[in-house]
Amino acid sequence: MSGKIVNYYDGSLECKGYLSVPKSTHDLPLVLVGHTWKGRSEFEDQKVAALNELGYAALSIDLYGGGVNGQSVEENQALIEPFIKDRQLFRQRLISAVEFGKTIKGVDSSKIALIGFCFGGLAAIELARSGYEISGCVSFHGLLNQSDQPFQKVNTKLLVLHGDKDPMVSSNQILALQDEMTESEADWQFISYGNTYHAFTNPAANDIEMGTVYNHDSDIRSWTAMSNFLEEVFSNVNK
């Protein structure tokens, strides 16, 4: 991979992202990549490379700060807990990453999107919920925990890509999210992949007891759905 580690800040907290901007004669759309509950890792950095192949600049972000990675289920749970409980913290951390992204040389600051996986999928939804406007947000097998913040008018287009057998998401949470997005006047899509568990895009996921299982077909289909969505939202800018 041809990217580099970059430091950016949320207040005084130093965050360590991974950035790659393909060579181009014009400024490129930027796609931010939100990480799983483990923290920013090679998985997200590989998504940066895959997004480069689609013609986009990409930045995998660091929501925890300091490049921290959890080493166990217990550590991962402890890392996400402050963000689940404090959505203002969550939103501010995300907005700081987006604002940094807008300053990157070679990036078209009017064309920004956020995609995320698992905890990062919730991050994509939470940024849309905040009312902060970017071109689009995409959630891959995201957690769907409801926010403690009041509904805002959602100004960002949202695509949610979900595994129908994901044990970490209840049917009530799905309905609540859909109702919330409709009430918030969002432009939203929700795609559910049959016979598909949590973490279906991660080839390393193989724990059926935990409900995290890679699914090749759903991985390919969801990436295609994301690609089509990004092409749409970036082409609609300024129209």
What are these regions (language model features)?
Residues 1-239:
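N-terminal cap/leader regions of alpha/beta-hydrolase-fold enzymes
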